[in-house]
From Swiss-Prot:
The active site is at C408 (phosphocysteine intermediate). Residues 168-285 form the Rhodanese domain. This is Dual specificity protein phosphatase 10. Signal peptide: none annotated. The lineage of its organism: Eukaryota, Metazoa, Chordata, Craniata, Vertebrata. The gene is DUSP10. Disulfide bonds: none annotated. It is found in: Cytoplasm; Nucleus. Gene3D superfamilies: Protein tyrosine phosphatase superfamily, Rhodanese-like domain. It holds the Pfam family Rhodanese. Its main location: cytoplasm.
Length: 482
């Protein structure tokens, strides 16, 4: 059977099956011409079919390389072009919604000016297999050009006003789009971090599979973002001045596009954090390490007078040695877990491995009691779920008169977080006091901001009695007054 002229058509999603009698088909013979079939330079034009579709919604469908599609709707008509199944995740990519009757011109020849044969009084939009519906794609530079900016001084005034009125909840929601490590080092006070630096998160956010709320890591940030119905939303990165010039692949563009899709009207901080910090550094939060340097005056001599060792500008993580935090509690890295001689010399009989991938070294020898806490050093890892399990294992080692080594990859973030939490549990130390105590013993520690937030939540539960402290017997080796 010869192929139907409708076999070469654009697939659209219609509200109901299209029957042949619903289509206004006309064959324009004016383009048949007197072309010589044997000529190589002028291929013959067989026909041009103009199809007038009366539909309220036209949805661009993914290409054939995308998700599987079916044109079989159960209709007995071979001309039915209803799409029975399609990828719902692509519905939000491009849509053309007409208030009245939408007339679409479809041509089987790209050389045919088919739109000239459509009534000029009707709203016309061209369709092609490559371009889809003739409507602007969400997130184009034209749309981002309409996003307003806010100057650093204006944001500072808003923040100061809310602070003086003691109503911080009425202030704007501030979103930081920079990489997580940069946010960890410094950010505007009260800003929540959106983690869309990885390709998977960016793609899911662009496709509408997740929202900006899903990418906020801390609980306080989520709660604040849920209450933004009447709030301003201010988004910033490192140094953007013109939102219209932001590339579509940049996190700032993706976040703005997602917020616009949710019906929000975000503002962009002109010049980003770099510009804001120049005149308003007092309204920025820095990491605890930077705060400590300021507290001691920033000088190396002052720092060395308060801490056993000065905090280096770039910690020598690779050459860090096994660190005794308490007489029976040691904090180390992967190399320390392999050093059998040192572990036996220090009477270590228990080991906590806070990784998902490092092996349990010397496990087959039966010399140590092991516990693995499968955790990654990421802004999405829930490390607090392992606190009590780790505490019980540490106490078991303590009661048996054995030392315990807790380690992760480098002994910087994951294992350090659990040690800090253990000190908070068994003393009256605040999170900051416990952090500084461990930092004084092992200067390279630097829990990521996600873990610091979990420690703050843990401190709140300890203070409120939700999680009881264990103060007896008193820990030996805690020299500070707590």
């Amino acid at each position: 059977m010869p192929p139907s002229p409708l076999d070469d058509r654009v697939v659209v999603a219609l509200s109901r099956p299209v029957r042949p009698q619903d289509l206004n088909l006309c064959l324009d013979s004016s383009y048949l011409g007197s072309a010589n079939p044997g000529s190589n330079s002028h291929p013959p034009v067989i026909a041009t079919t103009v199809v007038s579709l009366k539909a309220a919604n036209l949805t661009y469908m993914p290409s054939s390389s995308g998700s599987a599609r079916s044109l079989n709707c159960g209709c007995s008509s071979a001309s039915c072009c209803t799409v029975a199944t399609y990828d719902k995740d692509n519905q939000a990519q491009t849509q053309a919604i007409a208030a009245g009757t939408t007339t679409t011109a479809i041509g089987t020849s790209t050389t045919c000016p088919a739109n000239q044969m459509v009534n000029n009084n009707e709203n016309t939009g061209s369709l092609s297999p490559s371009s889809g519906v003739g409507s602007p794609v969400s997130g184009t530079p034209k749309q981002l050009a309409s996003i307003k900016i806010i100057y650093p001084n204006d944001l500072a005034k808003k923040m100061t006003k809310c602070s003086k009125s003691h109503l911080p909840s009425q202030g704007p929601v501030i979103i930081d789009c920079r990489p997580f490590m940069e946010y960890n080092k410094s950010h505007i006070q009260g800003a929540v971090h959106i983690n869309c630096a990885d390709k998977i998160s960016r793609r899911r956010l662009q496709q509408g599979k997740i929202t900006v709320l899903d990418l906020i890591s801390c609980r306080e940030g989520k709660d604040s973002f849920k209450r933004i119905f009447s709030k301003e939303i201010i988004v910033y990165d490192e140094n953007t001045n013109e939102p219209s010039r932001v590339m579509p692949s940049q996190p700032l563009h993706i976040v703005l596009e997602s917020l616009k899709r949710e019906g929000k009207e975000p503002l962009v901080l002109k010049g980003g954090l770099s510009s804001f910090k120049q005149n308003h550094e007092n309204l920025c939060d820095n990491s605890l390490q930077l705060q400590e340097c300021r507290e001691v005056g920033g000088g190396a001599s002052a720092a060395s007078s308060l801490l056993p060792q000065p905090i280096p500008t770039t910690p020598d993580i690779e050459n860090a040695e096994l660190t005794p935090i308490l007489p029976f509690l040691f904090l180390g890295n992967e190399q320390d877990a392999q050093d059998l001689d040192t572990m036996q010399r220090l009477n270590i009989g228990y080991v906590i491995n806070v990784t998902t991938h490092l092996p349990l070294y010397h496990y087959e020898k039966g010399l140590f009691n092991y516990k693995r806490l499968p955790a990654t050093d990421s802004n999405k890892q829930n490390l607090r779920q392992y606190f009590e399990e780790a505490f019980e294992f540490i106490e078991e080692a303590h009661q048996c008169g054995k030392g315990l080594l807790i380690h992760c990859q480098a002994g910087v973030s994951r294992s350090a977080t659990i040690v800090i939490a253990y000190l908070m549990k068994h003393t009256r130390m605040t999170m900051t006091d416990a952090y500084k105590f461990v930092k004084g013993k092992r200067p390279i520690i630097s829990p990521n901001l996600n873990f610091m937030g979990q420690l703050l939540e843990f401190e709140e539960d300890l203070n409120n009695g939700v999680t009881p402290r264990i103060l007896t017997p008193k820990l030996m080796g805690v020299e500070t007054v707590v």
